[in-house]
């Protein structure tokens, strides 16, 4: 059974790129367009790993991560932040919210899959 990954990003292009990279690597992908929808999909789909953007409407990535970590069954699910941001303070804020790792866009599909394999092991 392949790993199920939830991607949360308001950019349709980025969601499409993630879906292509992840399905090509053999993962099942479910998607959400912002943090609010992300929390709904998280509860419904119960993914093995999450990849989220930070800057999104309705509920940003920090709020999404904090919301996910409030639920016992999602406290240990790896959450990777995939964003254009590289500011150390934003990275620290994401870690404090409960993020597992940080990847800067644009991403290399092979490196993304490598990171997923490492954090999901």
Where do the PLM segments sit?
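Conserved acidic segment of CheY-like receiver
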Residues: 2-13, 18-22, 50
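Short hydrophobic/Thr-rich beta-strand motif most characteristic of the beta2 strand and flanking loop
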Residues: 26-33, 41
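Active-site beta3 strand of CheY-like receiver
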Residues: 45-51
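Active-site residues of response regulator receiver
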Residues: 53, 83
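Receiver (REC) domain active-site loop signature in two-component systems and cognate sites
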Residues: 56
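Short, glycine/charged-rich "phosphate-handling" switch motifs in NTP-dependent
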Residues: 100
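C-terminal output helix
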Residues: 107-116
